[in-house]
Amino acid sequence: IPDGVASDVDRAVSAARTAFDAWSQTPVEERQKYLVRLNEALQARSAEIAETIAGEVGMPITWSTMIQAGLPAGNMATFATLLDSFEFEEEIGNSLVVKEPVGVVGAITPWNYPLHQIICKVGGALAAGCTIVLKPSEIAPLNAFILAEIIHDVGLPAGVFNLVSGNGPTVGAAISAHPGIDMVSFTGSSRAGKQVAASAADSIKRVALELGGKSANIVLDDADFAAVIPKGVFACFLNSGQTCTAHTRMLVPNSRYDEAVEIAAAAVAATPVDDPTKEGMHLGPLISQAQWDRVQAYIQKGIDEG
């Protein structure tokens, strides 16, 4: 996998700026046809995408097929459908509101749902008439190269989509600070998001940040614990817990604490854990040693805190 540098970002931005004038003026109907073809191509290569991401991220193949390959194609189809009714011009009183493409969009995406996150950014930008410079996660980049092949095969004009692989401190930083980029869309940690926002501020870019967090699962006293506790465990363990909305903190009434622990422990014991390429598995490996160490630290912290 190429380890990009700032000069690679310069070339990608130059290509995106060159392509922007023509792409932004391309009729909506033509842009929509490209999105439809992209959706069809994503579906045609869904098995390959699912296997690739199962290998990169560790999500079991059954879930990878449904989520990691299914969501990107579905989202691309949604963007294509939106162009049927989206109003790029709207009359309000005696004023005309015109919605124009913002320009060159820098997209920096995470590793947990890699292609899904890429399509959420790239699909919308293409539909709006923007050109893109994408930096996928360096931990799970292969799916982005499949998308680049698909984009090439459907004939998207040169320079409309540009892929620069590499790490965040080098490629991500170059994208967020580049004067030729008009907007940055970032999904990842709060720490990195602060750096992206600070870098983008110098050139007054538009910035969209989706940052990490924790999700409380509140179970009330009158709930059916036998039904909801296992579902909470499932929601916590999906994608090995590597989900921004994973229900990692189950809060139950103190009077039913022991009951909840017993049901949760039984649900965990019944969770199939093995090679993610095997059918029927629910829990695969974590994506990296660093992530494994982080999870172990949280487990130990929980034990230490009682």
Predicted regions and their residues:
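N-terminal glycine-rich, Lys/His-bearing helix-loop that initiates the first secondary-structure elements
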Residues: I1
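Rossmann-like NAD(P) dinucleotide-binding subdomain of oxidoreductase/dehydrogenase enzymes
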Residues: F88-A227
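Long amphipathic alpha-helix in the N-terminal Rossmann-like dinucleotide-binding domain
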Residues: S14, V36-A47, I61-F86
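ALDH superfamily catalytic-core signature
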Residues: R191-G306
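Short linear capping/connector segments at secondary-structure termini
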Residues: T52-P60, E90-N94, G212, K278-G284
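Generic non-transmembrane alpha-helical segments
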Residues: R37-E48, I146, I150-L156, I229-P230, ...
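Residue-level signal for inorganic ion chemistry
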Residues: R31, I53, M76, G129, ...
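Glycine-rich phosphate-binding segment of PLP-dependent enzymes
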Residues: D10-Q25, E48-M59, L82-L83
